[in-house]
């Protein structure tokens, strides 16, 4: 261990974040590898080690011949300060080597509020922030993850960005980098060739042009670069990598359990949901494969809980069979099985009673909107009757805790829709009184609301976000009408949602603002300790950026959007159709009931999703 690190660790919170050496960590002989890759997560160890994508990529990249992939996480504020004061550069956990010594540095980006943390990590490693400032071939700095579906706000900082699922592309990028090192290519030559790999976006080869009103006129590709970058996906999901021997953290993390991924994509088509669109087509694993992975992961890790992961776990075709099989294994070993947020329209009490035998937890539903009219607008395809029926069954089974998640500020929302949330919560309380066999323990209903953030690659990508003031007015209206003592109301911070809305639909001009914020000390801004709206407003004013232009402005359907050249598999015609359906209050069937012809099925052999 570095002597500077030895002196620092007693001075910071949770020093185990920074030491590595966990059970399952991959160590390699440096003399036997010719490419060193740093897999960076721009948040704390506890968040990054809970991320399923990080665990998968760590395994996939270390399985490549001649490659050693190591992990790097953002230090907390106290550690960051100590590292700067003591002159300790950012390092990888496995070897302790400085980040600047690696051939490739890849960031996993899943949230827009992590952008400034990327800059903090690069600077802490002594690496120039902007791609244009890094003239040598290595270290190659790139990114992947869900927010790369709009790459433009961070385009100036990365050499390239992965569009789609990284485990299907990263190996090709590293192989090309290996060839480039051996042949002595310039960075420009490498990037020119990398741009020809499917799913690779090289921002420096594309120049945005703007109209007089500030909207995007066109994205001009350099000669030889593709006009449109099409995402890459894992086509054989059944046999794709699942890290059964994943690292077991030596300190507590957010999701301290086995996370078993059942399928990718979603059949539902909720119009606000970015993940449900960009992860199409639906691909699932067989019950047998899930059973195999689940048991092996539990045996290796020693965890006493396993959770079933997907965008809509209750839509997994073999859920009953899988839960039965896993519980046969788990019950005798005292291992708990948990399910994430459930859909009220296919809630199964049989499943819940079985999985709660070891460890009982509360129920979580996400109606998203307070009235049926608005649920139809967003294509939620869940009725109030569905929710109350599911709650009644649960209360009859002895449950006395329910969490309900909603959004405020959805397109076409009125005060009647807002008040509908309070009325629905009251009906849940009444339902408990009518159905609970034992009311002595009382009822806890937790209602949580967040502010709707319009996202790229969704039918609502053209919609405005309500202003901060309007969001808080609706929060106050709802809070004042929550009368039942059994109901607790929580709401998400309006300032963060506004900033997220700016970044999520931003263009390349935001890069200067992001760097400005970082230079003012901004990083780890997904945490309340790190976020400061005044800092963002100050930087926006200095860089000539209008928050209302990006967050609160309605786009026309023919406007050129900053992400139009990045094809995530769903065609524009489908988004427009769903946008029009929403404004007519019309539902669209789920993918299992009827194919919408969105275009995503073309990624799979035979052109058919596993809906």
Language-model regions: role of each:
Residues 51, 252-288, 597-611:
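Canonical Radical SAM [4Fe-4S] cluster-binding loop centered on the CxxxCxxC motif
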Residues 66-78:
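A short beta-strand-loop structural module common to alpha/beta enzyme folds
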Residues 2-27, 31, 37-39, 484-611:
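Radical SAM enzyme core and accessory elements
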Residues 75-220, 459-507, 515-528:
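Glycine-rich beta-alpha loop elements in corrinoid/cobalamin-binding modules
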Residues 77-78, 153, 207-212, 317-318, ...:
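Flexible glycine/acidic-rich beta-alpha junction loops that bind and position SAM and/or redox cofactors
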Residues 37-43, 61, 248-274, 298, ...:
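N-terminal pre-triad scaffold of radical SAM enzymes
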Residues 39-40, 113, 295-403, 408-446, ...:
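Conserved SAM/AdoMet-binding glycine-rich loop
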Residues 8-38, 45-46, 203, 209-259, ...:
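N-terminal [4Fe-4S]-dependent radical SAM core
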């Amino acid at each position: 261990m570095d002597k500077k690190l030895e002196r620092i660790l007693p001075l910071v919170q949770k020093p185990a974040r920074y030491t590595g050496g966990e059970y399952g960590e991959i160590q390699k002989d440096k003399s036997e590898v010719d490419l060193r890759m740093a897999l960076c997560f721009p948040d704390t160890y506890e968040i990054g080690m809970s991320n399923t994508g990080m665990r998968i990529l760590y395994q996939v990249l270390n399985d490549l011949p001649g490659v050693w992939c190591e992990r790097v996480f953002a230090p907390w504020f106290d550690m960051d300060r100590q590292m700067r004061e003591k002159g300790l550069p950012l390092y990888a956990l496995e070897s302790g080597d400085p980040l600047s010594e690696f051939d490739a540095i890849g960031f996993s980006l899943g949230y827009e509020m992590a952008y400034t943390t990327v800059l903090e990590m690069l600077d802490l490693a002594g690496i120039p922030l902007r791609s244009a400032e890094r003239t040598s071939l290595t270290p190659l700095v790139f990114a992947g993850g869900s927010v790369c579906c709009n790459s433009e706000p961070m385009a100036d900082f990365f050499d390239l960005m992965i569009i789609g699922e990284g485990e299907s592309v990263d190996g090709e990028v590293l192989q090309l980098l290996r060839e480039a090192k051996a042949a002595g290519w310039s960075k420009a030559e490498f990037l020119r060739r990398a741009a020809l790999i499917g799913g690779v976006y090289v921002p420096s080869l594309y120049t945005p042009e703007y109209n007089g009103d500030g909207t995007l006129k066109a994205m001009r590709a350099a000669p030889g670069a593709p006009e449109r970058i099409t995402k890459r996906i894992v086509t054989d999901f059944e046999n794709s990598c699942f890290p059964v021997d994943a690292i077991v953290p030596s300190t507590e993390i957010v999701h301290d359990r086995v996370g078993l991924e059942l399928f990718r994509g979603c059949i539902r088509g909720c119009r606000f949901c970015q993940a449900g669109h960009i992860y199409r087509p639906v691909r699932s694993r067989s019950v047998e494969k899930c059973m195999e992975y689940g048991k092996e992961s539990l045996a290796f890790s020693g965890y006493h809980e396993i959770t079933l992961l997907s965008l809509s776990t209750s839509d997994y075709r073999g859920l009953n069979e899988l839960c039965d099989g896993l519980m046969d294994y788990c019950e005798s070993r005292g291992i708990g099985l948990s399910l994430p947020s459930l859909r009220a329209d296919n809630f199964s009490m049989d499943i819940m009673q079985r999985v709660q035998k070891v460890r009982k937890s509360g129920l979580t539903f996400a109606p998203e909107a307070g009235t049926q009219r608005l649920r139809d607008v967003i294509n939620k395809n869940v009725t109030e009757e569905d929710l109350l029926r599911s709650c009644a069954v649960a209360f009859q089974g002895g449950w006395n805790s329910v969490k309900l998640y909603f959004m405020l500020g959805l397109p076409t929302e009125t005060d009647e829709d807002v008040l509908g949330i309070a009325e629905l919560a009251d009906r849940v309380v009444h339902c408990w009184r009518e159905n609970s066999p034992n009311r002595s323990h009382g009822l806890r209903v937790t209602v949580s609301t967040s502010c709707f953030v319009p996202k790229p690659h969704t039918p609502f990508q053209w919609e405005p976000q309500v202003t901060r003031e309007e969001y808080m007015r609706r929060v106050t209206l709802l809070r004042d009408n929550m009368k039942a003592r059994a109901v607790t109301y929580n709401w998400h911070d309006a300032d963060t949602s506004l900033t997220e809305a700016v970044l999520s639909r931003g263009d390349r001009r935001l890069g200067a603002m992001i760097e400005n914020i970082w230079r003012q000390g901004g990083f780890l801004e997904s945490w309340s300790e790190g976020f400061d709206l005044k800092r963002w407003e100050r930087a926006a004013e200095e860089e000539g950026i209008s928050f209302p232009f990006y967050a609160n402005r309605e786009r026309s359907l023919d406007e050129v959007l900053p992400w139009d050249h990045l094809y995530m598999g769903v065609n524009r015609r489908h988004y427009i159709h769903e946008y029009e359906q929403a404004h007519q209050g019309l539902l669209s069937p789920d993918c299992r009931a009827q194919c919408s012809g969105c275009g995503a099925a073309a990624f799979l052999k035979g052109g058919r999703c596993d809906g």
